[in-house]
């Protein structure tokens, strides 16, 4: 697609410019081919015609080149015209033309094409200024162009098929608007300024007019001129630059303060026919200090009262023609003469430009009745160079003083008195002077007045109220701190008796003459002297002054000085004391006489000289204090040794051991004290939903298990009947009998879950502690204390009621026997326990019986035995996926399987306390490693038990017993312990009874897994344990039978138990 001018494409393509209209009309419809490109069939004859035609066309093109300069050149490139900018003049009517340009597509030879334009001036504002024929592609203009609004129009020609698709790529059409001189120059209001009295050719300002025509052409080249001036011609303008200059140096702001000029600008550089424009220029005249200020009058008269000050005397107005409120206008007043005493001052009021005369000091009518002042005036700014001042003009101000009634006054204002400080020449209460005031008007002594002291800091003076006689109240002191330059000042007041009263003030100055009333004294009473040195500088001072002070004389009083010293003069106030021999380190005292210039001495003075060892700096070295062991220290040491010897003797009178001190045991108050009779509570209500707590199998978890006596056989690790169960980690046991099986199942589901979770947490925390962490007391003390504590707890629990066991109907278990319940009901009313009360009731019993009750004690012997530590691994009731295992360790004969190995054999020292139970509290914190036990009184029955081994350990309790085949127990009530645990299904349950052995200081042993089964031999004591409020309660009662019966399976938490085993 191409864009064509009104000329044929043939000529545009070949020559770049439009052909003449005649030629264009002739070849408008010819194809874009040269005549030289005709077929070869024309022959040579046609060649000559072609050559002639080409020469004619070429000649016409060259001749018409200047006329066709406004036509756009077109270059055909493939199927698209690239058109240089097309130029149209503004304000020219091109609407009569058939078209100003033409666009065509080569596709129109094959099909119908629709042409359109887009861009500013076509489909954008200003809309429809340019239009195109939809079928012929002719571009027309529909209005006049304005270059000042749009200098160039950027259009795009569009060719589309009838279906709306593009037939060609859009072609750019740029229309350039040529400028015409249609805009006149425009001026803006311009304001300039110049100082008055400026010299000729002084540049005031430059003005510039604007022209909207095309820049850089004659259409915008402006020539300036002044058309009119408001006053006389004082300025001229540069024709080309527009600069305005001063024509005459007679500008005077006081006459004309501004000028208004009318300036003209013509484009085309002022040529005829150019456009012109005018504007206004305002020039302000700036002020300079070319006027000297003056006053309204030459002489001013005023009056002022005496004895007044800081009052305004008169105002004088300054006149200045310069610009108001500027430094050229502001006046400066100067007192030239008449104010030598400084009575007056003059200032300027900046608002009114007035001079204000002020009175600063009081005037005395009797001394000065009239003052004549000379004043000059000038400006704050410097005068202009045109101002010539030959001499300063002065103005006169006449001031008259008005007499006023005055108060009396002291004359002189300061009265000086000279007095010696020598007490023999001063007589107190004697008149030393009279200081009466005078009348200011008559100059005679004032009457109708009274006198008083105004200021007397040291109370030296006494004044007579009526006569003004001055007396001394104390002896003057030349060394007094109240003296200033050896003069004491006091103020005397004279007060009139009229109303209002008037006051006059006078000053008494007492000059004190020095008297030699002080002796010279040593400044430093103590001096230090380095060893092997001999010189000490001694300095004295005297409060008196010359000639009653220095120079001083020094002398050593040999009568009171042991060492030999000589004195040398150093200066007027100091002397050199030289030792005649070398002094050893120590303190020496010298008696020194010192006298002043007048020979006054007040007795010998003591000088302390300390001789010490010195370093390189000649400074005494610090003295090392040596402590010696004196007699008092020896006595204290002997007393301490005697006390150490006395303490073992006192211990002989103390009761030691658990049996002997059972009644005097004082438990550490960790728990609240209980009452004598403790009542049990019923089991908790029905709890249908209990979540199972699963615990993974861990081979590294520590577990302690208590053991009871009996016979057992260890299996090979598979399921078997369990004779007795162990507890997980702590000594928390479950009592399980046929008649109370269901009840304890309910208790385990409530309190047991809580207890297990707490034991699990204690166990995990205990893993981080060593065997002796947290242990602060000795092993002997702890062992004794635990033994007494356990005995006390056992006895205290024995006094309570027995636990009543009921069937828990919510569990599908077989009903047990109620025989034990009936027996317990009879035992509840049994008050036989009151016959064997604790020792704390001993005093009450003695009061009631009226006699002294003797305590019974049992001596228990012990012997060293060898024991083997046995540890067994037990795993109980791992739900669905773990094997059901349980194990326990029983004191008695033990048959071990082949998978258990002997790890160590150690000799242990063990002791059994007959009749007492040492049990570990499972609720103690595992990290402390300390378990408190209480002490109980033993019953009167006798208990014989074959002695096992006893071990102490600060860790969790582990019950280890040496294998003894036989346990012998005497008849009667025996304290024991039972251990019970939930067991898997089809497990055998049996209860074993035996005295409890408390083990402490268990050594870490190797571990082995295994399960133990066997039979247990019953003895005549059984233990029942229950949980109340998350605590452990045990009951002890006589046994009735051996309970061998199948135990129902309980749904309890999966527990993993580890029991240390030693072979």
Curated annotation (Swiss-Prot):
The keyword Transmembrane appears for this protein: yes
Any one biological process term the GO annotation gives: homophilic cell adhesion via plasma membrane adhesion molecules
Residues bearing glycans: 163, 188, 485, 571
Molecular function terms, GO-annotated: calcium ion binding
UniProt cross-references to InterPro entries, sorted A to Z: Cadherin-domain_protein, Cadherin-like_dom, Cadherin-like_sf, Cadherin_CS, Cadherin_Y-type_LIR, Catenin-bd_sf, Desmosomal_cadherin
Pfam families: CADH_Y-type_LIR, Cadherin
Transmembrane stretches, start-end: 633-653
Gene Ontology cellular component list: desmosome; plasma membrane
Location relative to the cell: Cell junction, Desmosome; Cell membrane
Keyword Magnesium (UniProt): no
Organism domain of life: Eukaryota
Cytoplasmic compartment segments: 654-1063
Keywords tagged on the record: Calcium, Cell adhesion, Cell junction, Cell membrane, Glycoprotein, Membrane, Metal-binding, Repeat, Transmembrane, Transmembrane helix
Cadherin domain residues: 106-187, 194-295, 296-410, 411-522
Biological role stated in the UniProt entry: A component of desmosome cell-cell junctions which are required for positive regulation of cellular adhesion. Involved in the interaction of plaque proteins and intermediate filaments mediating cell-cell adhesion.
Protein name: Desmoglein-2-like protein
Lineage: Eukaryota, Metazoa, Chordata, Craniata, Vertebrata
